[in-house]
Amino acid sequence: MKKRIIFLIFFPFFIYAQNIGSLDGRILDDQDQQPLEGATVIIEGTSFGVVTDENGYFVFENIPTKSYNLTISFLGYRTKTIYNVILKSFGTPTIQVLLEESSDELEEIILVQSPFRTTRETPLSTQTFSAVEIETYPGGNNDITKVVQSMPGISPSIGGFRNDIIIRGGAPNESVYYLDGIEIPNINHFSTQGSAGGPLGLLNVSFIREVTLSSSAFGAEYDNPLSGVLSFEQREGNSKRLAGNFRFGATEAGITLEGPLFKKKENKSAKTTFLFSVRRSYLQFLFELLDLPIRPDYWDYQWKINHKINKYNSLIFLGLGSIDDFSLRSPKVFDPSIQASIEQAPIIKQRTITAGLSWKKKYKDGNGLMTTSVSTNRLGNIFSRFRDNISQSNVVFENDSYEWETKIRLKSVRYFDNWKTVIGTNFQNSTYSNNTKNVLYGLNYNTKIKFLKFGLYA
């Protein structure tokens, strides 16, 4: 009885503790990525407001957990509003905001912000949206591809539950994808080789700062896209403390961690930060309980490490990978339709990984940025069918494909008054191999081909 009384006394305090949280972030210059000291950050509809420190950081503490709009303003820069920032009691991601410089002086006018942002180079074909918009998008389920499919000019896949992106009537394999300036060949689980489409998204939304979709008139720095470009910009990890969150969904569970590395002083921001996440599905266990013959099983992992060498130089090491397996099991109850599905379904083993290292150098005059990156991506895909798919014995058909690409990119961006110039070069070394075996037709061949490609653009 005594324990119950104590619990009832302190229970309201426990509830209150779960209804408050903290929100931190960083404000940077859009051109040279320099921190903006003294920028004002206000939570709309409240009395909460802070000013950024010398490193551009701000912190709100003991804020009620709900959805807020943040307004960021700084003298000489355009005021920016971030909508629907969801504050949680634990694990709220760090916000990173880039402000655009404004050199024009105007009379007082009323501006209404469009929900989609565009650029001067491609004002009609480029759309930019933030991670907050992805998380709060109805029906998006924290899947970036599903949100992109609802954009103007984009058509979803018409063949099954797939995340294919079809731009203006093109093909799913005609778009390219970039993660912090590094090309990634795949953004979905169980992807079709040569196309990034698949049933489940691969990228962790909590890593993303913003996503830019170019459905036409894309910049020259992108390597020969036919239909469009989808560029993902990731945020930096928390430089002051360790943070993270655990997600438990209907089909999967995942954990995300972020924080400083090699931090020496308690009150100072670390020069090295990290972001890391891993996710595991448990669909195979659910399907086993439902007595279904299919067993999809997937893992994915993602990381990003930022290291600031000095005021003008920084290094970024990032990566993304997946482990996908699709197998079959014998159900307790058989009927002709289940038997036909088991005989026709393939056994899939797919492994993907992309890793890249980037060096970013800011010009000392503050009017540009040079980026040098080296990346590699590998894909292994084994597609098999057996006379007995349950025991995986007596192979009938097998296709073992392997891709390995290494890329080097150099990009220099300079700003002159209202002009922007982009100059760069790229180099790519690719190896593709294929081993196909078909017992029914007596086919068994092994092929391998290599390519070297380089280019210049301005």
Language model segments and positions:
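Periplasm-facing N-terminal accessory domains of Gram-negative outer-membrane beta-barrel systems
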Residues: 15-108
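Membrane-embedded beta-strand positions in outer-membrane beta-barrel channels/transporters
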Residues: 57, 94-96, 164, 210, ...
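Periplasmic N-terminal accessory/gating domains of Gram-negative outer-membrane beta-barrel systems
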Residues: 78, 86-91, 112-219, 229-231, ...
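Extracytoplasmic loops and strand-loop junctions of Gram-negative outer membrane beta-barrel proteins
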Residues: 130, 192-197, 213-214, 238-240, ...
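Short strand-turn segments of transmembrane beta-barrel domains in outer membranes
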Residues: 197-201, 209-220, 225-259, 278-280, ...
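Transmembrane beta-strands of outer-membrane beta-barrel pores
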Residues: 215-217, 234-236, 248-252, 261, ...
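Transmembrane beta-barrel wall of Gram-negative outer-membrane proteins
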Residues: 249-282, 291-325, 347-369
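Face-selective signature of the C-terminal outer-membrane beta-barrel domain
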Residues: 306-324, 346-458
